[in-house]
Amino acid sequence: RAALAESDAEANDLTAECTIHLPEDTAEFAARFTDGKYDSRISFTAKEELTIDVPGEAAGLYVAWYTAPEACVVESLDADGNVIKTESADTDLLNGYYVLPSGCAGVRISGGRAFAISELGVYDAETPPEALCIMSVQKTQPKVMLIVTHTGDEAYYFGSILPFCASEDVAVAFIMARSRTAQQEAIELQYALGSRMQPIFAGFQYF
């Protein structure tokens, strides 16, 4: 726990120093990116883009997607607006952390398809703070899979075995999730237990 605190202390949140540029019809909702509510979001059409002016110390960008992006690109820009790095967002992850190169003055996020973002953060560290709970994609063929119906069921019914699910060879899968917040809570629980593999969310309608 002390090590986690030290890691977070080394990463400074620079989000307040950034300038966010949104399409005109959603510009008034910029505060949704930092309200800590994963169910609030700003949606973009396939033709719209988000740009962020970042300070010189910026080294990492956190994006909490409302749904896993289907075709999004994160571009780092220099002071003249030239692209100096391009990275495709992982289509299987709800939360991403993207390293910004030296000389980065801005970031542009766009997609070949519609997308939505719940939270944004800019930090002065290439390594994501532990509090963000950044995870990796589950293995294609894990040795063990724990399948539960709803988010929250894993703790209620299987709480005693969850500590043993931290291995990368174990996948936790949810048939349905009540909300994006519920998905985030499931991610944070698995992360706290030591897992670095994001749970699988099948996406069936909640009932």
Task: Describe the function of each predicted region.
Residues 39, 70, 87-88, 92-97, ...:
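Active-site rim/loop-helix segments in enzyme catalytic domains that contact anionic ligands
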